[in-house]
Amino acid sequence: GGYGTREAYEILERICAAGLIDYVDLDVAIEPDQFWLGMPPVFVEPHVYRPYAEAVRKAAGKVPVLCVLGRLTSIADGEAAIASGVCDVVGAARALIAEPSLVKNAFEGNEERSRTCIACNWCLHSMLDDGAQTCTINPVSYRERLWDPEKLVPAPQPAKVTVVGGG
């Protein structure tokens, strides 16, 4: 049962036209056996949800749209989505887990310093496994208090180390 996307867009159009909401927050519902698509992994093309965002933008009229495009990895991607008119605000959870300073770095003209989410979905798996969200790219994720840079002190003696299998 239920209703499909066509009906959802019609309902949204009527609600927006009536002035009943201030903004639309687009998220994507998924089937239980495809929960992983809620956070598109590396083998799913970037911005997989853009067609839904475009349809919501059309139905919403002038009501602002916040959307999740799927695998947004850079400020440039978000700016392009906003500039194209597909949305007014973009969501980027994994990009900010991988690099909490992503927006700050972009404002300062240092986006190249930002770590990029590789969509491996370790953040999702770690949360499901033990409730502690961790990140392959950002080892400090979920451990911010333990990795306080002001608490780190240099080793008393320099050491030579060899990294084997660093990839």
Label every PLM stretch briefly.
Residues 1-166:
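Flavin-dependent oxidoreductase catalytic cores
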